[in-house]
């Protein structure tokens, strides 16, 4: 034979390796590509919506913590002036006896802040 090789009873011609693409339906390929792009855009939109919701929830949490910090600062300023805020009086008096579970959380939270602040 000339340049052909015989492998497992088949005659192979030298040249390109691998699969030879069959006649590709260009319209079908283009439609698959468009569908894939639509799905990609939809996934991207959902991801951005999720991230925006996450950011807004974190911003709300930050605002709540800032308000709580301002409240504690006001309490400290009042105690520096010799006044005891009514909220602290309520914590120190009967409220702890009425609801020990909820106040114990508040008490540990307050003690955590007062021990860590150098005021």
From Swiss-Prot:
Chief place where the protein resides: nucleus
GO biological process assignments: cell differentiation; positive regulation of D-glucose import; positive regulation of DNA-templated transcription; positive regulation of fat cell differentiation; positive regulation of lipid biosynthetic process; regulation of DNA-templated transcription
Places the protein is found: Nucleus
Leucine-zipper: region residues: 62-69
Biased composition (Low complexity): 102-119
Region spans: Basic motif: 29-60
GO cellular component: nucleus
GO molecular function: DNA binding; DNA-binding transcription factor activity
Domain of life the protein comes from: Eukaryota
bZIP domain: residues covered: 23-86
Bias-annotated ranges (Basic residues): 10-21
Function of the protein: Probable regulator of creb1 transcriptional activity which is involved in adipose cells differentiation. May also play a regulatory role in the cell cycle.
PANTHER family reported in the protein's UniProt record: CAMP-RESPONSIVE ELEMENT-BINDING PROTEIN-LIKE 2
Protein name from the UniProt record: cAMP-responsive element-binding protein-like 2
Organism whose genome encodes this protein: Danio rerio (Zebrafish)
Gene that encodes it: crebl2
